[in-house]
């Protein structure tokens, strides 16, 4: 049976401070962890959301070791490890070492004098927590903020940012070489598991050489030579894909295949359609000279959900990841976030955001502000109809006399100046809480990563308000 929590101890009682004689009790990190600990103890709903995922049958299957021994870590410890990881910016290995060596971290994560699990165990448990549960946990935390009168929801500001996926810059030659490399590796493992009947030719060296020549090629007539190199690389990739398809067909009729062989065959079956897509887009762009639409491009065979985001920013013409919309109140708490697929316009989110805001706070925001990308006449009308008294969104382009006068109003300028503060909050999320780049794999894990970062950020903001009180 999965344990939900360990026996509760007062984190800062004297009997647990024997190892902390050298720690200054006015240390900001110590006080911050103390406040976060109190918030988590006060809100069992947050732990319930996490425990539901870890204790579910699917969660138990993911956490079962090869030998059938369950992972010895409670849901509460997993939640606190996830929070500490994002709060301090640790990798999983650094997190396990820091908890093991620091008595304050041991107390915060509720390990006390127990043996700290291996970092891979901590990783597996944290990755079980779903994005839906983190959304619910964040909502429960916001309700606590409302109850403590930290946030009233009377003023709201919006902005978007891009969270990158963990991929290399997408180049056709690199994508083609990646498909050859991974297909060859899987075919090699399938042959080891299934015997010599699974035959293939290893073209990975030739593929790597062609990809390298394409990337570093210089000199005269480079475009013509690069096209010839691409033709050869495309030919190699096509040959490897054909071999992979033959191996998958053989594996389908092989009843005595081991578990490893079946796993390799399943991965081959999943990768082959992606290899066809990579071949198609490279052929269209390089050989035929077509402009491939962004929604038809595959940017990575590992993170297939990655989108191209073009926001027109100087120095970053294109970003690879997902656009995320954030709404924040006067307290600095993130009251709402939404991860998008594709690259929708920012002006499409206001109506949904207002509906969610009313569901959370019970009333519309009296003041709403956002940058010019959110502007549309429909958005201003919707905000006013839902009860917004002051809506400050700069209209791009030509302005008539009435609009110019509106932009000069003191309340309008005050709201736009206040809106600028969200840039600093987003910078903190990106730099301090790991939202610059998501290192978790798959679309669901991407959403969960954003969720745990926002939850940790809100916990720190709420803890800061509690310390001031």
Q: Locations of the language-model features?
A:
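Charged, often Cys/His-bearing segments associated with DNA-binding zinc-finger transcription factors
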Residues: 1-53, 468
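Basic, short loop/linker segments at the boundary and entry of helix-turn-helix/winged-helix-like folds
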Residues: 30-83
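Trp/Phe/Arg-rich N-terminal binding region typifying the photolyase-homology
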Residues: 63-75, 89-134, 146, 156
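Short, conserved catalytic/metal-binding motifs centered on acidic residues
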Residues: 81, 95, 116-122, 152-164, ...
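Active-site- or DNA-interface-adjacent structural scaffold in DNA-acting proteins
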Residues: 112-303
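Basic, amphipathic alpha-helical segments enriched in Lys/Arg and hydrophobic/aromatic residues
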Residues: 268-274, 410-469
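Electropositive, glycine- and tryptophan-enriched low-complexity nucleic-acid-binding patches
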Residues: 305, 313-360
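Helix-centered, glycine/charged polyanion-binding patches within enzymatic domains
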Residues: 367, 372-439
């Amino acid at each position: 049976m999965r344990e939900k929590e360990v026996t509760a101890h007062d984190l800062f009682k004297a009997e647990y401070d024997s190892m902390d004689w050298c720690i200054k009790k006015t240390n900001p990190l110590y006080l911050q962890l103390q406040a976060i600990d109190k918030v988590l103890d006060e809100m069992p709903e947050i732990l319930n959301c996490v425990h539901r995922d870890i204790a579910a049958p699917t969660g138990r299957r993911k956490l079962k070791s090869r030998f059938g021994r369950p992972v010895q870590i409670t849901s509460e410890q997993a939640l606190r490890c996830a929070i500490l990881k994002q709060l301090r910016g640790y990798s999983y290995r650094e997190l396990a070492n820091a908890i093991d060596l620091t008595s304050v971290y041991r107390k915060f994560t509720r390990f006390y004098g127990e043996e700290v699990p291996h970092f891979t165990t901590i990783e597996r448990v944290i990755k079980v927590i779903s994005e839906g549960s983190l959304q619910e946990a964040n909502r429960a935390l916001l309700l606590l903020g409302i109850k403590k009168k930290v946030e009233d929801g009377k003023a709201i500001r919006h902005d978007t940012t891009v969270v990158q996926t963990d991929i290399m810059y997408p180049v056709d030659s690199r994508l083609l070489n990646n498909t050859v490399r991974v297909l060859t590796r899987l075919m090699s493992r399938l042959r080891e598991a299934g015997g010599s009947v699974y035959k293939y030719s290893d073209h990975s060296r030739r593929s790597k050489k062609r990809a390298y020549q394409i990337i570093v090629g210089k000199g005269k007539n480079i475009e013509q030579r690069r096209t010839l190199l691409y033709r050869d690389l495309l030919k190699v990739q096509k040959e490897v894909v054909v071999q992979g398809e033959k191996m998958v067909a053989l594996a389908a009729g092989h009843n005595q295949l081991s578990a490893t062989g079946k796993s390799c065959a399943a991965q081959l079956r999943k990768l082959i359609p992606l290899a066809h897509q990579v071949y198609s887009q490279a052929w269209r762009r390089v050989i035929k000279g077509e402009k491939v639409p962004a929604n038809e491009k595959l940017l990575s065979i590992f993170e297939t959900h990655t989108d191209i985001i073009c926001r027109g920013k100087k120095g970053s013409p294109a970003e690879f990841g997902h656009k995320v919309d954030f709404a924040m109140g006067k307290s600095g708490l993130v009251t709402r976030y939404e991860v998008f697929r594709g690259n929708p316009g920012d002006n499409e989110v206001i109506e949904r955001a207002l509906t969610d805001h009313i569901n959370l706070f019970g009333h519309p925001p009296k003041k709403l502000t956002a940058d010019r990308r959110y502007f549309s006449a429909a958005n201003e009308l919707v905000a006013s109809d839902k009860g917004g008294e002051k809506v400050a969104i700069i209209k791009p382009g030509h302005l008539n006399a009435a609009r110019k006068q509106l932009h000069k109003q003191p309340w309008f300028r005050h709201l736009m100046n206040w809106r600028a503060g969200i840039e600093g909050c987003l910078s903190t999320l990106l730099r301090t809480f790991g939202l610059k780049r998501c290192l978790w794999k798959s679309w669901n894990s991407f959403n969960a990563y954003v969720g745990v970062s926002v939850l940790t950020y809100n916990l720190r903001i709420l803890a800061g308000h509690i310390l001031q009180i």
